[in-house]
Each structure stands twice: as structure tokens, then as C-alpha cells.
């Protein structure tokens, strides 16, 4: 997170999702993109894993499992919180590079930062298959050496 006094230099929300699918359009995640239109609650209709690293103005780092069954109900039913950190070592630091690794392999998905595994979740079948995406909110982020590898 770049913090040098720029317009979007805001220390918050290095968020990503993976294994994303739309249960209503299982063959095309993008079919309802216009309807979702960046509205956060409309993403509750997707099936995915989500990490909000340094979310809520850099006060939380959370791991959620969106189940794609949004019916207007409570968030904890649609996207249950699997784990949360609120301690300083698991929040964003200004102008620091991060090595983030997300794995979906051998019945498990993991999310690690700088070699520390923060989140682990057991999966079955094709549960880890799907799309990857970044969700950044009014911040300034630089990426280098971005890779997607299939094992």
C-alpha cells in the first residue's frame, strides 16, 4: 500500500477473492456483471472465498466463504466469517511489499502473507475451482511479479 500523501493513498482494503462462480450462471461469471455493477451486496450472490486484508479502515483482516445463496438475509448466513485478525501484525503497514500466496490444492485452500499461513479451509470436489479477482477501494496499490500457476 503506497502512502506518500497522494489522493488515493489510503491504508485499507487489499482484498481479493478466488474460486468465484455465479450459481445462477455457472458457465459464465460475467453474465450478470452489469447487474452487480460494483455494488458490494450484489456480490453476495456469488460462491467464493474472500479475504479482506486490512479492511474496515485497516482494523480487521477477515476470511469469508460466500455461499452464493443471497436472499436479502443476514450477512453471517450468506458470507460466514471463518476467521478474523485484529492485531497489528496482521494489518497493513504503509509502504511495505507483501508476498501473498493463495493455494487450492489437495482438498485445501490456503492464504499466506510473507510465508505465514493466515487462513486454511478444507474443500471438496470442484469447490476451489473458479475465478480470481482483486477488490480495491480508494487506495493506491502496486503489484509486481503477479503469477497464476496451475499445479
Predicted regions mapped to residue ranges:
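Extracellular glycan-recognition regions
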Residues: 1-151
Amino acid at each position: 500500500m503506497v502512502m506518500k500523501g497522494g489522493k488515493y493513498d489510503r491504508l485499507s482494503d487489499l482484498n481479493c477473492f478466488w474460486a468465484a462462480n455465479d450459481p445462477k450462471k455457472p458457465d459464465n461469471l460475467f453474465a450478470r456483471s452489469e447487474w452487480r455493477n460494483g455494488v458490494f451486496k450484489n456480490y453476495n450472490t456469488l460462491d467464493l472465498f474472500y479475504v479482506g486484508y486490512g479492511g474496515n479502515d485497516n482494523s480487521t483482516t477477515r476470511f469469508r466463504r460466500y455461499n452464493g445463496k443471497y436472499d436479502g438475509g443476514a450477512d453471517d448466513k450468506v458470507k460466514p466469517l471463518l476467521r478474523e485478525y485484529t492485531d497489528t501484525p496482521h494489518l497493513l503497514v504503509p509502504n511495505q511489499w507483501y508476498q501473498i500466496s493463495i493455494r487450492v490444492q489437495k482438498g485445501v485452500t490456503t492464504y499466506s502473507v510473507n510465508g505465514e499461513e493466515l487462513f486454511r479451509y478444507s474443500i471438496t470436489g470442484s469447490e476451489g475451482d473458479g475465478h480470481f479477482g482483486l477488490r480495491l477501494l480508494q487506495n493506491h496499490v502496486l503489484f509486481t511479479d503477479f503469477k497464476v500457476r496451475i499445479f
